[in-house]
């Protein structure tokens, strides 16, 4: 379960970093930054809904390969 949480957190951080690079919000325009972060969070929730079941399905296979 800890591995799934770690993968999930890595995905969220990567998604936020990618979004910040692509959107390039300016520091003085706080409204744009807030909207960008809101979009990132809602996007991360959508990604998590797909990624968590995939992670749960893949984890036993990886455990068999490793162990």
Curated annotation (Swiss-Prot):
UniProt record, GO biological process: defense response to bacterium; innate immune response; killing of cells of another organism
Thermal dependence summary for this entry: Thermostable. Still active at 100 degrees Celsius.
Keyword Coiled coil on entry: no
Propeptide: 24-35
Subcellular localization: Secreted
Name by which UniProt lists this protein: Ceratotoxin-C
Keyword Ribosomal protein: no
Subcellular location, principal: secreted
Classification of source organism: Eukaryota, Metazoa, Ecdysozoa, Arthropoda, Hexapoda
Record-level GO cellular component terms: extracellular region
Keywords associated with the record: Antibiotic, Antimicrobial, Cleavage on pair of basic residues, Cytolysis, Hemolysis, Immunity, Innate immunity, Secreted, Signal
Species for this entry: Ceratitis capitata
Gene that encodes the chain: CTXC1
């Amino acid at each position: 379960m800890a591995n799934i949480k770690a993968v999930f957190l890595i995905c969220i951080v990567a998604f936020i970093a990618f979004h910040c690079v692509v959107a390039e919000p300016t520091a003085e325009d706080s409204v744009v930054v807030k909207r960008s972060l809101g979009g990132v969070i809602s996007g991360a929730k959508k990604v998590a809904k797909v990624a968590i079941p995939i992670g749960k399905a893949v984890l036993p296979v990886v455990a068999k390969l490793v162990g």
